[in-house]
């Protein structure tokens, strides 16, 4: 639905969220720690997004790197892994490491 947002970072909410404006609209975006650490207040940024709909909420998750978003999408397809858990996993390991562990079905590394 919303694949990429390019705009100005208006507000940073540590540890992993920001408000970003694009074309006069402000977006609340939750990010993994590595992406969050690359953002600078009042600077332009492009964030790859995943729009996540639940019964009780509509959430926007953001990633500086498109590959990181793709790994996030792979993770949430795994039974028992929700969006918040996938975000926490991407905060603890790089997207490349997680992708490798998912492809190898390495349960010990993922728990």
Please state what every model-predicted region is.
Residues 6, 10-109:
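Long, highly charged, low-complexity intrinsically disordered interaction regions
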Residues 1-5:
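Short coil-to-beta-strand transition motifs
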């Amino acid at each position: 639905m919303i694949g990429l947002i390019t705009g100005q970072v208006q507000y940073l909410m540590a540890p992993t969220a920001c408000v970003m404006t694009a074309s006069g609209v402000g977006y609340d975006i939750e990010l993994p720690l590595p992406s969050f650490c690359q953002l600078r207040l009042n600077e332009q940024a492009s964030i790859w997004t995943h729009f996540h709909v639940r019964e009780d909420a509509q959430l926007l998750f953001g990633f500086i790197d498109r590959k990181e978003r793709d790994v996030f999408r792979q993770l949430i397809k795994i039974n028992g892994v929700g969006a918040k858990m996938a975000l926490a996993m991407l905060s603890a390991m790089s997207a490349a490491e997680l992708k490798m562990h998912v492809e190898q079905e390495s349960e010990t590394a993922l728990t």
